[in-house]
Swiss-Prot record:
GO molecular function, one term: G protein-coupled receptor activity
GO cellular component, one term: plasma membrane
Protein's gene: OR4X1
InterPro entries assigned: GPCR_Rhodpsn (IPR000276), GPCR_Rhodpsn_7TM (IPR017452), Olfact_rcpt (IPR000725), Olfactory_Receptors (IPR050427)
Segments on the Cytoplasmic side according to the record's topology features: 48-55, 119-137, 218-233, 288-305
PANTHER family: OLFACTORY RECEPTOR
Transmembrane segments: 24-47, 56-77, 99-118, 138-156, 194-217, 234-256, 268-287
Topology of this chain in the membrane: Multi-pass membrane protein
Protein name from the UniProt record: Olfactory receptor 4X1
Family according to the record: Belongs to the G-protein coupled receptor 1 family.
Disulphide-bonded residues: 95-187
Extracellular topological segments: 1-23, 78-98, 157-193, 257-267
Role, per record: Odorant receptor.
Keyword annotations: Cell membrane, Disulfide bond, G-protein coupled receptor, Glycoprotein, Membrane, Olfaction, Receptor, Sensory transduction, Transducer, Transmembrane, Transmembrane helix
Length: 305
């Protein structure tokens, strides 16, 4: 099907039509986005420069932090810039590209979180075989699988939408291009595509969440036979990961597991998985991990790690 598009650009409603309020919101997003880039960037650089943070856990954490920067960068800079110039507009091609990129990095993050859960399972439940299983080749393969999974998810979410005609209206009640608000602008029957989106996005969010929770229940069951010191260290690492998982997957499930209808609350819910999770990632992982904190202090202090 060849799409006939009378719409060449899309206008975002955003959070508010009051420009004073919008400017305050844009300043808040600017501060949060700056913190996302600096915090996650510091984790990436610290791990790359460190001679101590060499375990697979930190290898995966560096990739997760890099993906968080990319994920947040898909929509935050444009939202901030548009708010200051008072023109919340994006081209149709730009909108579709933003939607594809958002789901690519979001899907990659979801798969990386599952990879990190598997890494913790092997480290805690099979410590004697950990380095043999999680060798350099396996770590590289798991990262490539995460990127590939994110790409397949994004293609599955957006390919059919790229074929739809858009003939008006062109006003989107959101602050970035996502599948639900984009489908509402299409001049065609989107029922079948909506089902595919629920199956793809919703199932990945829900299934991934329950698989991750199940893996941590297995770890908790295994830890009952460990001493208190070992339990505390393992639980501290797992608690950090579970917190990130909850902040990311619960809001995603609320948005993508239901029919493709945009609700006013979607904009607030979306803030959690597009900004809040990337913002809290460095706080959760660094503040609860003595090795990361010490490595950061040495790196910032200009010492050899």
């Amino acid at each position: 099907m060849v799409a006939t598009n009378n719409v060449t650009e899309i206008i975002f409603v955003g959070f508010s039509q009051n420009w004073s309020e919008q400017r305050v919101i844009s300043v808040m997003f600017l501060l949060m986005y700056t913190a996302v880039v600096l915090g996650n960037g510091l984790i990436v650089v610290t791990i790359l420069a460190s001679k101590v943070l060499t375990s697979p856990m930190y290898f995966f954490l560096s990739y997760l932090s890099f993906v968080e920067i990319c994920y947040c960068s898909v929509m935050a800079p444009k939202l901030i810039f548009d708010s200051f110039i008072k023109r919340k507009v994006i081209s149709l091609k730009g909108c579709l590209t933003q939607m594809f990129s958002l789901h690519f990095f979001g899907g990659t993050e979801a798969f990386l979180l599952m990879v990190m859960a598997y890494d913790r399972y092997v480290a805690i439940c099979k410590p004697l075989h950990y380095m043999a299983i999680m060798n350099q080749r396996m770590c590289g393969l798991l990262v490539r699988i995460a990127w590939g999974g994110g790409l397949l998810h994004s293609v599955g979410q957006t390919f059919l939408i790229f074929q739809l005609p858009f003939c008006g209206p062109n006003i989107m009640d959101h602050y970035f291009c996502d599948v639900h608000p984009v489908l509402e602008l299409a001049c065609a029957d989107t029922f079948f595509i909506s089902l595919l989106i629920i199956t793809n996005g919703g199932s990945i969010s829900v299934v991934s969440f329950f698989v991750l929770m199940a893996s941590y229940l297995i770890i908790l069951h295994f830890l009952r036979s460990h001493n208190l010191e070992g339990q505390h260290k393992a639980l501290s690492t797992c608690a950090s990961h579970v917190t990130v998982v909850d902040l990311f997957f619960i809001p995603c499930s609320l948005v993508y597991i239901r029919p493709c209808v945009t609700l006013p609350a979607d904009k607030i819910v979306a803030v959690f998985y597009t900004v809040v999770t990337p913002l809290l990632n460095p706080v959760i992982y660094s503040f609860r991990n003595a090795e990361v904190k010490n490595a950061m202090r040495r790196f910032i202090g200009g010492k050899v790690i």
